[in-house]
């Protein structure tokens, strides 16, 4: 009975994520047709003085090595930057807990994003990061 309830919740979560995936698919298709990478400032090649790393993990465990693998991979990427040139943003509680416990300064954390997954929330995060990149506040978003 408990397993059936968990399965149903997982199926509901997948259904809730479907509009997000459809928007993303449409966006990528539109970009491929309409964007000239040479003229678009998002694709500009510039020296990296300040980077933002966005870590997306789950809020809870029970997904095998998923969260740990992501965090270890990100940690190896963080070693390429100095503390002054790096900003760490986490989406999901597991990533926040991992980096916070290792004395990394997490500038921003988005927990419980997956509880009520909506395209508008993901879009808000992406718009904020894009605006910071285009304004020159940061030179790379990973």
Residue ranges and their predicted role:
Residues 1-142:
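Conserved loop-to-helix interface motifs that mediate assembly, gating, or partner/ligand docking
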């Amino acid at each position: 009975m408990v397993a059936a309830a968990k399965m149903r919740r997982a199926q509901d979560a997948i259904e809730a994520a479907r509009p997000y995936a459809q928007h993303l698919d449409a966006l990528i298709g539109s970009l491929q047709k309409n964007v000239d990478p040479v003229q678009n400032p998002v694709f500009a090649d510039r020296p990296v003085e300040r980077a933002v790393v966005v870590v997306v993990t789950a809020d809870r465990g029970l997904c095998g090595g998923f969260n740990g693998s992501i965090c270890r991979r990100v940690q190896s990427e963080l070693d390429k930057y100095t503390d002054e040139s790096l900003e760490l943003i986490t989406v999901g509680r597991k990533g926040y807990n991992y980096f916070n416990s290792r004395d990394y300064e997490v500038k921003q954390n988005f927990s419980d994003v997956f509880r009520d997954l909506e395209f508008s929330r993901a879009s808000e995060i992406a718009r904020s990061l894009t605006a910071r990149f285009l304004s020159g506040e940061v030179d790379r978003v990973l």
